[in-house]
Design a protein with these regions (language model features):
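Polytopic transmembrane helical bundles with strong interfacial aromatic enrichment
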Residues: 1-153
């Protein structure tokens, strides 16, 4: 494939990835604010579905296309902006894999119970607070990547 084809795939991956993590965070916060167990439970299930369908797909497109284009700039270590961008992408992935996904799994298990009726347990809200804080960081890192990939400082 040509460089431009990989670039289009890379941009598509960024749009899918960043679009999903941003929109998911917004509607999860809005659903949680209702404190309605049925709404919160439904939103929590959708977080899992959309992460599998869109976040993972976008991340895969970014990773593969980024690797394929990196050679044009001397590889991942060939340019400072590329090295930093790769590090930010990995850091965001580490946050997702080590904390956000496990939190989502725990919240989904809790949501299965209260989504059919019943009170939302305090543990769900403690996990939600942690998810919001770490999620903000996991969103900020790819946003910084956009600057690096466009400006190439």
């Amino acid at each position: 494939m040509t460089y431009n084809t990989w670039l289009v795939l890379h941009i598509l991956g960024v749009v899918i990835f960043l679009g999903n993590i941003t929109v998911t965070a917004v509607w999860k916060v809005l659903a949680d604010r209702t404190r309605n167990p049925a709404v919160v439970g439904y939103a929590q299930r959708l977080v899992t579905v959309t992460d599998i369908a869109f976040t993972a797909t976008g991340a895969a497109l970014i990773a593969v296309s980024g690797q394929m284009m990196a050679g044009r700039f001397g590889g991942i270590g060939g340019a400072g902006w590329l090295t930093l961008g790769f590090a930010l992408f990995i850091a965001s992935g580490v946050i997702w894999i080590t904390t956000l996904i496990p939190i989502q799994i725990m919240q989904a298990r809790l949501a299965r119970r209260f989504g059919r009726g019943g009170a939302i347990p305090d543990r769900y809200w403690r996990l939600a607070t942690l998810w919001y804080a770490l999620g903000a960081i996991a969103i900020a890192l790819p946003l910084a990547n956009i600057y690096l990939m466009v400006a190439k400082p």
